[in-house]
From Swiss-Prot:
N(1)-(5-phospho-beta-D-ribosyl)glycinamide binds at E22, L23, E82, D286, K355, R362, R363. SUPFAM superfamilies: Glutathione synthetase ATP-binding domain-like, PreATP-grasp domain, Rudiment single hybrid motif. Involved in the de novo purine biosynthesis. Catalyzes the transfer of formate to 5-phospho-ribosyl-glycinamide (GAR), producing 5-phospho-ribosyl-N-formylglycinamide (FGAR). Formate is provided by PurU via hydrolysis of 10-formyl-tetrahydrofolate. Homodimer. It comes from the Bacteria. GO terms for molecular function: ATP binding; magnesium ion binding; phosphoribosylglycinamide formyltransferase 2 activity; phosphoribosylglycinamide formyltransferase activity. Residues 119-308 form the ATP-grasp domain. This is Formate-dependent phosphoribosylglycinamide formyltransferase. One of its GO terms (cellular component) is cytosol. The keyword Glycosyltransferase does not apply. The gene is purT. The lineage of its organism: Bacteria, Pseudomonadati, Pseudomonadota, Gammaproteobacteria, Enterobacterales.
């Protein structure tokens, strides 16, 4: 049985968050509910999770020496990555020295870039995926596109939220797509993946939890993407029993191969009864923010419960629910939100992330809604998000 200490006391159970965005903030809050001492880390000050942590630090998390020095200073019981852009070699070394990395350092290393996880899924586990090629320079990139065929998709092997991604329809787009991919990688210029276009009816995120009492699944989450980033998500996504069983089988294989305890966001394409693996994040997923209103245990609560070695038991899904992002475009280091009364009502909630600044378009919050049907919940969430006025 897991023993939890008390924050700010000698017995404290300490969790170090590597990445302190909106997802990390919710993880920090769930840790706080259990009296856990939270140390939030990011590359910039006043990040969302830092605002609800006991302590915070600003470092370059791609600097392995700086990361190891901070871990030696804080001596956390759990190191919890929230983003991909981390010195994963340092995590592997720390784990070998006895530190607990959530879910495992291997999972963090394999999923920090698309090459590691794609090779695991397609080549080691034999799971169905899109056709793909990797390229390290422009000549290899053009060759990969020729092999895959048009249209195709190019992504930096290490990026998130759609950064550096392009949908290539013609050869005239190749040069600009290559340059955009080189600018959008989280660790700078480098290798890309070229993917064939998959025919699918919809995409899902299957939140899969590996815990002391086994593997658990949340109801499938549907979502709409725009410019590579999610705009709305909803739960449950309707799908055939055959497809759901296949999705769960794929997700369980991936999660068990990565190892460790925690929640994983497994992304899948669904076409009829067929299911194709896309990606996996070994941590809460942005599309899973809908679970803040759709389940008795949110994805964040499930992640914390799992990595602490506590049983999940069961997950209750309340019915149709949706999330819609609040995505303004402006420049300010003093953001204010207005017209909130028009955004709230029965079955409506808001989460405003507390990001310290914005320069361009940035996700600053999310509206959450329940409804009679999924379509009703989506419409209510979108209307709530649209009602929020954001000013600098």
């Amino acid at each position: 049985m897991a023993m939890l200490g008390t924050a700010l006391r000698p017995s404290a159970t300490r969790v170090m968050l590597l990445g302190s965005g909106e997802l990390g903030k919710e993880v920090a809050i769930e840790c706080q509910r259990l009296g856990i001492e939270v140390i939030a880390v990011d590359r910039y000050a006043d990040a969302p999770a830092m605002q609800v942590a006991h302590r915070s630090h600003v470092i370059n998390m791609l600097d392995g020496a700086a990361l190891k020095k901070l871990v030696a200073q804080e001596m956390p019981d759990f190191i919890v990555p929230e983003i991909e852009a981390i010195a994963t070699d340092a995590l592997v070394e720390l784990e070998q020295q006895g530190q607990r990395v959530v879910p495992t350092a291997r999972a963090a290393r394999l999923t920090m870039n698309r090459e590691g996880i794609r090779r695991l899924a397609a080549e080691e586990l034999g799971l169905p995926t899109s056709a793909y090629r990797f390229a390290e320079n422009e000549a290899e990139f053009r060759e990969a596109v020729a092999e895959i065929g048009l249209p195709c998709i190019v992504k930096p092997v290490m990026s998130s939220s759609g950064k550096g991604q392009s949908f290539i329809r013609s050869e005239e787009m190749l040069e600009s797509a290559w340059q955009y991919a080189q600018q959008g990688g989280r660790a700078g210029a480098g290798k890309v993946i070229v993917e064939g276009v998959v025919k699918f009816d919809f995409e899902i995120t299957l939140l899969t939890i590996s815990a002391v009492d086994g593997v658990h699944f949340c109801a499938p989450i549907g979502h709409r993407q725009e410019d590579g980033d999610y705009r709305e998500s909803w739960q449950p996504q309707q799908m055939s029993d055959v497809a759901l069983t296949r999705a769960q089988e794929i997700a369980q294989k991936v999660v068990e191969a990565l190892g460790g305890y925690g929640l994983f966001g497994v992304e899948l394409f669904v076409c009829g009864d067929e299911v194709i693996f896309s990606e996996v994040s070994p941590r809460p997923h942005d599309t899973g923010m809908v679970t803040l209103i759709s389940q008795d245990l949110s994805e964040f609560a499930l992640h914390v419960r799992a990595f602490l070695g506590l049983p999940v038991g069961g997950i209750r899904q309340y019915g149709p629910a949706a999330s819609a992002v609040i995505l303004p475009t402006l420049k300010s280091d003093d953001v204010k939100f207005g017209e909130l009364s028009g955004a709230l009502g029965a079955g409506l909630q808001l989460r405003l992330f507390g990001k310290p600044e914005i320069d361009g378009s940035r996700r600053l919050g999310v509206a959450l809604a329940t409804g009679e049907t999924v379509d009703d919940a989506i419409a209510r969430a979108k209307a709530s998000a649209a009602a929020v006025i954001v000013k600098g």
